[in-house]
Amino acid sequence: MATDIDMLIDLGLDLSDSELEEDALERDEEGRRDDPESDSSGECSSSDEDMEDPCGDGGAEAIDAAIPKGPPARPEDAGTPEASTPRPAARRGADDPPPATTGVWSRLGTRRSASPREPHGGKVARIQPPSTKAPHPRGGRRGRRRGRGRYGPGGADSTPKPRRRVSRNAHNQGGRHPASARTDGPGATHGEARRGGEQLDVSGGPRPRGTRQAPPPLMALSLTPPHADGRAPVPERKAPSADTIDPAVRAVLRSISERAAVERISESFGRSALVMQDPFGGMPFPAANSPWAPVLATQAGGFDAETRRVSWETLVAHGPSLYRTFAANPRAASTAKAMRDCVLRQENLIEALASADETLAWCKMCIHHNLPLRPQDPIIGTAAAVLENLATRLRPFLQCYLKARGLCGLDDLCSRRRLSDIKDIASFVLVILARLANRVERGVSEIDYTTVGVGAGETMHFYIPGACMAGLIEILDTHRQECSSRVCELTASHTIAPLYVHGKYFYCNSLF
């Protein structure tokens, strides 16, 4: 029977859908009832076994070699699939004539020999067995027992039984092994999962060694718990609260009205004026016989720049004397530095430009006499105050001016502090003051001349005292005429002449 079935499979026929198989099963049952002494009752029908690729495990030659070469079946069973199944040699004589080849088997012709290298086409390619054998859903007699020959134990013929094949429908009924039969599910170790091919199947029979199993479902995978961390667990983040003023702070703000009074404000002004009468605390700069005595002493009233005007020649002649006074009196110099910082931050634009010229002219005098640039000096040590006040006064105007000239912005000039960014008098003042302020903030003991753009053996000849004020006023006036913006014109005009004409609308004070 196995030989005929191979012939049908090679022809691309599906035995599961033909009526021959059903007819063969019926005739087989009748033959078994007629012959109760037959030992083939334990055999499985060729359509009930797992089908395997005839090209595997030795190919067609191995299958042909495994087919029993006994005498043909009884004549009365010829012409049916089951009747062609070989019977034991004891029930048929050696001289009996072979059965007549009638019926469908004779019409199909001679079986074509299959080559082990030639792949099967048609339906055979689609019904190749899966990687693992699936248990027959009916169980019972379908499983094959090991060690049993073709005709049962003690049979006369010891020829090995050929591999059985199953139709496509029977294979689909078995399906793959269920996930419960796997050994790599939850609770199984890694070694057990690797030895899954050697574990017992659901039906109780051992699986072939080395066969692959179907992947387990996602929920059956064993997940390794995360390693315990010795650090404390991160507390859960709370939702950000609303951004409000603390009630205690609100109470403090409202309590100001309880303490504010005209008398108390007046007393505060009086105490501040008393402190300013002697800012040095009885230890001022020694001014006896000094050409700088008028400026070293304290005075009441405002500052008049014209009364303090000196020429470059006078500064060169008497500048070293003032320099030595600052260096010889560090405590007085520290007080003078603090007082100068407060004054510089309250100046208008013209006064701020004069302070910038004062700082640069002082540096030029020091370089002229080869004196170190000391950060503790009251004039050099307050370069940051001059820069911040100038930037505040010039920012509304410089935003338009620097952009129109294609230069770096105000903040970039002050933060980069590069000599290569200097393109005009405005950028020169801002960059040099920013470099001096940076050195003072870093706390260096001495500032080198390259900070102000002077190389070794050079003098600050490119700077003329007064260039800051004259150059910035010129820039303001020129850009005001060139720019078509009315806002820029108003800004430049008020920067040069800060006269109040409009802007403030009320003054409200409910306390005093």
From Swiss-Prot:
Subcellular localization, as worded in the UniProt entry: Host cytoplasm; Host nucleus
UniProt modified residues of type Phosphoserine: 16, 18, 113
Provenance organism: Human herpesvirus 2 (strain HG52)
PTM comment for this protein?
Answer: Methylated within the RGG box possibly by host PRMT1. When hypomethylated, ICP27 is exported to the cytoplasm earlier and more rapidly.
Give start-end ranges for motif Nuclear export signal: 5-17
Stretch list, region RGG-box: 138-152
What is the name of the protein in this document? mRNA export factor
- Interaction with host ALYREF: region residues: 104-112
What keywords were assigned to this record? Activation of host NF-kappa-B by virus, Activator, Early protein, Eukaryotic host gene expression shutoff by virus, G1/S host cell cycle checkpoint dysregulation by virus, Host cytoplasm, Host gene expression shutoff by virus, Host mRNA suppression by virus, Host nucleus, Host-virus interaction, Inhibition of host innate immune response by virus, Inhibition of host IRF3 by virus, Inhibition of host pre-mRNA processing by virus, Inhibition of host RLR pathway by virus, Metal-binding, Methylation, Modulation of host cell cycle by virus, Phosphoprotein, RNA-binding, Transcription, Transcription regulation, Viral immunoevasion, Zinc, Zinc-finger
What's one GO-annotated cellular component? host cell nucleus
What is this protein's function? Multifunctional regulator of the expression of viral genes that contributes to the shutoff of host protein synthesis and mediates nuclear export of viral intronless mRNAs. Also stimulates translation of viral transcripts. Independently, plays a role in the regulation of virion release. Also plays a role in the inhibition of host innate immune response by targeting host IRF3 and thereby preventing production of beta-interferon. Silences the 3' splice site of the host promyelocytic leukemia (PML) intron 7a, thereby switching PML isoforms from PML-II to PML-V.
Give the domain section of the comments: Binds viral intronless RNAs through the RGG region. The N-terminal domain is mainly responsible for the inhibition of IFN-beta induction.
Give the region (Disordered) as residue ranges: 1-242
Per UniProt, the CHC2-type Zn-finger stretches lie at 400-488
Name of a matching Pfam family: Herpes_UL69
Single GO MF descriptor: RNA binding
Residues modified to Omega-N-methylarginine = 148
Query: Which parts of the sequence carry Dimethylated arginine?
Result: 138, 150
Residues annotated as binding Zn(2+) are 400, 479, 483, 488
Q: Which GO terms describe its biological process?
A: exit from host cell; regulation of DNA-templated transcription; symbiont-mediated activation of host NF-kappaB cascade; symbiont-mediated perturbation of host cell cycle G1/S transition checkpoint; symbiont-mediated suppression of host cytoplasmic pattern recognition receptor signaling pathway via inhibition of IRF3 activity; symbiont-mediated suppression of host gene expression; symbiont-mediated suppression of host mRNA processing
Q: Where is the composition biased (Basic residues)?
A: 135-149
Transcription recorded as keyword:
yes
Its quaternary structure? Interacts with host RBP1; this interaction facilitates the RNA polymerase recruitment to viral transcription sites. Interacts (via the RGG box) with host ALYREF/THOC4; this interaction recruits ALYREF to viral replication compartments and probably directs viral mRNA to the TAP/NFX1 pathway. Interacts (via the RGG box) with host SRPK1; this interaction relocalizes SRPK1 to the nucleus and seems to alter its activity. Interacts with ICP4; this interaction modulates ICP4 DNA-binding activity. Interacts with host NXF1; this interaction allows efficient export of HSV-1 early and late transcripts.
